[in-house]
Amino acid sequence: MGWYTWANHWARVLYHSRQIGEARQADLLVVELFGFLHDSCRENDGKDPKHGVRAAELAKELNTQFFELKPKQLDTLCFAITHHSGGDVSLDATIQTCWDGDRLDLGRVGITPSPQYLSKEAHPHIETALAMSIRGH
């Protein structure tokens, strides 16, 4: 999968996450960084179970060089990145917002987002997000 395809995915995740994050009062800096970093260490779009762990390590390396997160923010970002592919749900507004943004773009791999894995604030975005994923922008 080329960088162009990944850039479109990251942009859609960022778009969805920011909309939901504002409604949920999530930490938007963490949400935005998640959008760019969560799949940055993927080796392919198929099975790559360690890509989240690698991306969380990258986030730690980039902190203080390219962005300034407080320790709790960095922990939240790294947890969200590490566990974003597992199908978990979180009561933490920022973590769930990150996961919502990524899950709303599952249409790019032929999967319709399931409301049971999304916050209630994400539910109204499913149809639009699916259309965006299928169109590729």
Residue spans for each PLM region:
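Juxtamembrane helix-loop transition sites at the ends of transmembrane segments
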Residues: 46, 59-60, 123
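An active-site-proximal "capping" alpha-helix that borders the catalytic cofactor pocket
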Residues: 13, 50-65
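Divalent metal-dependent phosphate-bond-processing catalytic cores, especially two-metal-ion Mg2+/Mn2+ enzymes
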Residues: 1-26, 37, 65, 69, ...
